[in-house]
Amino acid sequence: MAPLTEASRLGVRPFADSDKVELRFVKTAEEVRSVIWSAYRQVLGNEHLFESERLSSAESLLQQAQISVRDFVRAIAQSELYRQKFFYSNSQVRFIELNYKHLLGRAPYDESEIAYHVDIYTSQGYEAEINSYIDSVEYQQNFGDSIVPYYRGYQTTVGQKTAGFPRFFQLYRGYANTDRAQNKSKGQLTWDLAKNLVSPIYPADAGSLTGVSTGNRGGNTYRIRTTQAASPNSPRIRQSISRVVVPFDQLSNLLQQLNRQGRKVISIALS
């Protein structure tokens, strides 16, 4: 996983520099412990976990190879612990945003994804809502049964919408930050998704950014840095970085154009 040039400023350096946490067929006790704590950290949004809160039964089943990593992730997200931290105290939209972040490692791409999960919860209930992420084709393709979910929203990959890049950083506020520490119970992407807008990205330590600005951004300009995405069959060569400054009202169209051209977005920031 190649690190981003702006990884330190955006607070994703620890993820960009680390390997996926995977439980292989032949495993050690230390590897199982690493998977357990990585799963807690990811699914619980970096929340501190007390000893009394641990899911001892699910941990034991994983240690005995009676359940997969995917099943353990499901057990955490289906638990009363997860409900207390993220379901009871948040609006439905905020809960769905966090489910995307915790279970798929990205932000919702558009309003239709929110509506889809609202419908699942309303018609089928809590467990079906959680299962809809973990049993999805997207989850299977990225994590399978053995990999702990990880943040993917800061990467540009095949099938990922470019709007997901800046929206991810409205939900993710740094490696040491926790979701509940943001003190946000309402949806953070409601405005952008409803208007099909893209918000600016601020460094993770910028005190001024704690959520979405819903003011008029029409006068802002944004600096975008891109590089040509490497083809799977092409030789590895050093790619040049391009920079472009664009007004807010042209930002969404430009991101779509860059995606069609096969360019990889490195960073988006206020100019």
From Swiss-Prot:
Keywords: Antenna complex, Membrane, Photosynthesis, Phycobilisome, Thylakoid. Residues 1-180 form the PBS-linker domain. The keyword Membrane applies. One of its GO terms (biological process) is photosynthesis. Transmembrane segments: none annotated. Residues 219-271 form the CpcD-like domain. PROSITE patterns: CPCD_LIKE (PS51441), PBS_LINKER (PS51445). It is found in: Cellular thylakoid membrane. Belongs to the phycobilisome linker protein family. Rod linker protein, associated with phycocyanin. Linker polypeptides determine the state of aggregation and the location of the disk-shaped phycobiliprotein units within the phycobilisome and modulate their spectroscopic properties in order to mediate a directed and optimal energy transfer. This is Phycobilisome 30.8 kDa linker polypeptide, phycocyanin-associated, rod.
